[in-house]
């Protein structure tokens, strides 16, 4: 037998060994463990699925209506009984087997992908979806209608991660259309998700527009929601004497705790025409109504906002002002600040 002929069986054995040791990822089963709790409301359950694969460990927990499952009924008894039920989604079917009692249960699950769904997704531009991808789509109920709806709304070729994020956070086709009708079209998936996460809804936009805020960016809207610059806050500030401000100013006031009560307190002491910048600067540097009241009681009733801020920046305390006033009844704010700058006490 030639050397070449003898080498062929060895090569075949090597290939077979490699195949046995390193199975193809596509052949790996999608399965794992599940834990279910029946919620106080009879029609909902909390389901947690846990998997360990070559990707690592993953866990997903969601509240579902019991109608999302086929064959799931709540046992009357607190004693475990065998259970088998399914979650049928466009992307495939999850089959759950294990034990259930009146409070919940646990067991193993497996997932069978739907090849027809994968083919439809390929036609929509989402090709090369793995079984792992399809499992994720099933868990989060990313169905044909959702993907087609986003495509029709102007998002035909979203990445898989964008699809999942938009589904999880409720950036639905209807949400996208509603925003587009208000002038917010062509937003990025990240912008849409951020708006949903922080509650920058069409209703929120409408309330702001009623107050004169017509051309806010998506970033403005998200920042206002994050920091609590709500329509109610803006109305309160207007009633206190600070009229329409920019989105940035509204956010700055919220960050630095400029409240309607703060502004009203200052107005009562003669500061009738505060700007949002004035109010923010006073809050940043600790010019409180109490500080202003004490300074005025020492005779500095005409101190401007800039004077008050300068006094706080340079450490002109009420005790220092009182002591200097006792020495020189005619001392001015500028002189007090200069004394502190140069270390005189």
What would you call each of these model-derived segments?
Residues 2-12:
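Bacterial N-terminal signal peptides that target proteins for export
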Residues 12-23:
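Bacterial N-terminal signal peptides
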Residues 22-345:
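General marker for long, soluble alpha-helical cores
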